From Swiss-Prot:
Keywords: ATP-binding, Endoplasmic reticulum, Nucleotide-binding
Keyword Endoplasmic reticulum part of the UniProt annotation: yes
GO molecular function: ATP binding
Main subcellular location of this protein, as a coarse class: endoplasmic reticulum
Name by which UniProt lists this protein: Luminal-binding protein
Family assignment from sequence similarity: Belongs to the heat shock protein 70 family.
Amino acid sequence: KEEAKVLGTVIGIDLGTQYL
């Protein structure tokens, strides 16, 4: 999801990878 990518970039790549 694009949202996850944005959140991951803002909060941390860790979250982005988890949601990806």
